[in-house]
Regions:
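N-terminal leader/targeting and assembly helices and adjacent pre-domain segments
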Residues: 1-58, 62-65, 109-236, 330-334
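Accessory DNA-engaging acidic/polar modules
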Residues: 52-112
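Ordered, soluble secondary-structure elements with a strong preference for glycine-centered loop motifs
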Residues: 76-77, 200, 239
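Residue-level detector of short coil/turn "hinge" positions at structural boundaries
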Residues: 93-94, 223, 238, 268
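Short loop/turn and capping residues at structural boundaries
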Residues: 96-97, 227, 242, 299
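Acidic, glycine-rich two-metal-ion catalytic cores of nucleic acid-processing enzymes
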Residues: 235-236, 240-334
Length: 334
């Protein structure tokens, strides 16, 4: 225990989580999302037959999937020739929908037959795509418990120890205090949290596909547009992988710091919000309010702890996307 003068405090330099610490975890999560979810979905959107003929008429465009009829409007590709043909059939262009409107009962029979056939194909594609996302979701639910991130946890731990040795003064003795069993327990929690985050994202994506995309496929959305949408969501998946990696790494390092500080007799810290009391436009109100205040690492000792959206007490850096810092306070005693 430190022996210094009474009634004085000394603030230590904060040890913050580095962006590089989550790099390997981000790459691993991204690979999992691509391999087990997005790439199979992209494969499911590929055409099984090829037709190299260039469509010219409205019916040919509908057959090719470049244009589809949703029951009121023609959607998809637009051209002067198509506009002229639809207008000749009595169609009216809607500026609000940015599409041509034409009641089906005013169409010639051959065009109605083409639309009916395309609807049948759309039903088949809807069923196929629905089965694919259900199958992938079940596969990931079975695979997720087998995922292991112990290596990433160990590397993050080593990086944290190195950073603490660099920033904490030699007069403050902070040594690794976790035995192998404790480290294994924290690594298990880390892995389980990452697994839950991955599954949460997959479940939300499946729900999104069911609510937003399957109805569009049912109306006639073609494979090309479907593939483009999946590619767009793949980009979202990459962003999510980065977010999950950042968040879980921040939580893991926060827990490690908390244990080591307490073992060293450092029971309190001062909350430092980005932008101080005024924030910077991204800082949470509660975090701006906490700026400059002292808190115990032991939440049970805090009368008014900072809480997340779920009502759980949190330290700086533990809430989603939180960039705040915990400034360790060394209490000087006789």
């Amino acid at each position: 225990m430190l022996r210094l003068k009474k009634n004085q405090q000394r603030e230590l330099e904060p040890v913050t989580t580095k962006e590089t610490w989550s790099k390997e975890l981000r790459a691993k999560i991204q690979e999992l999302l691509e391999t087990y979810f997005f790439e199979p979905l992209i494969d499911a959107t590929k055409e099984t037959t090829l037709d190299n003929a260039v469509p010219k008429t409205l019916a040919q465009h509908i057959k090719s999937g470049l244009v589809w009829y949703d029951g009121a409007y023609f959607r998809g590709k637009k051209s002067v020739a198509l506009s002229k043909e639809i207008r000749s059939l009595g169609g009216v262009f809607s500026t609000s929908e940015k599409a041509w409107r034409l009641p089906e009962n005013r169409m010639p029979q051959d065009l109605r037959n083409t639309i009916a056939e395309r609807r049948r194909q759309a039903q088949v594609l809807t069923k196929q795509f629905s089965e694919v996302i259900t199958k992938l979701q079940k596969q990931i639910q079975l695979s997720a418990p087998k995922l292991n991130f112990d290596v990433e946890a160990a590397k993050t731990d080593r990086a944290l120890q190195k950073e603490m040795q660099r920033k904490v003064p030699a007069s403050v003795s902070i040594q690794p205090v976790l035995n192998d069993e404790q480290k294994a327990h924290m690594a298990t929690d880390y892995t389980e949290n990452v697994q839950l985050s991955i599954m949460g994202f997959i479940d939300s994506e499946v729900e999104r596909f069911r609510k937003q995309i399957l109805p569009q496929i049912q109306k006639g959305m073609n494979r090309k547009d479907l593939a483009e949408y999946v590619q767009e969501r793949l980009g979202v998946g990459k962003d999510r992988a980065k977010f999950i990696a950042r968040q879980e790494t921040a939580l893991f390092t926060s827990k490690l710091r908390e244990v080591q500080y307490q073992k060293a007799g450092i029971e309190k810290y001062r909350w430092r919000a980005i932008g101080g009391k005024s924030g910077d436009g991204r800082t949470r109100d509660a975090h701006m309010e906490a700026h400059g205040k002292e808190f115990f690492w032991d939440h049970s000792k805090n009368k008014n702890p900072v809480r997340n959206s779920e009502g759980q007490p949190v330290h700086p850096g533990e809430d989603f996307g939180c960039r705040c810092q915990a400034i360790p306070i060394v209490e000087e005693i006789k």
